[in-house]
């Protein structure tokens, strides 16, 4: 499983499973199976 923190939505094959936080910015945690 590969995960990324993305600011603007997930790629088509990725799933949003949580959130990442850097300072005041919240990113989506997107994982690919």
Curated annotation (Swiss-Prot):
The record's Gene Ontology biological-process terms are: defense response to bacterium; defense response to fungus; killing of cells of another organism
Give the protein family.
Belongs to the alpha-defensin family.
Q: Which cysteines are joined by disulfide bonds?
A: 3-31, 5-20, 10-30
Q: What is this protein called?
A: Neutrophil defensin 3
| Organism annotation | Mesocricetus auratus (Golden hamster)
Q: Would the keyword Disulfide bond turn up in this protein's UniProt record?
A: yes
| GO terms for cellular component | extracellular region
Ordered alphabetically, the record's keywords are:
Antibiotic, Antimicrobial, Defensin, Disulfide bond, Fungicide, Secreted
* Subcellular localization(s) per the UniProt record: Secreted
Q: Is Transcription there in the keyword field?
A: no
**UniProt cross-references to SMART domains, sorted A to Z:** DEFSN
């Amino acid at each position: 499983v590969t995960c990324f923190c993305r600011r603007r939505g997930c790629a088509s094959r990725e799933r949003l499973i949580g959130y990442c936080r850097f300072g005041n910015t919240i990113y989506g945690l997107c994982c690919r199976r």
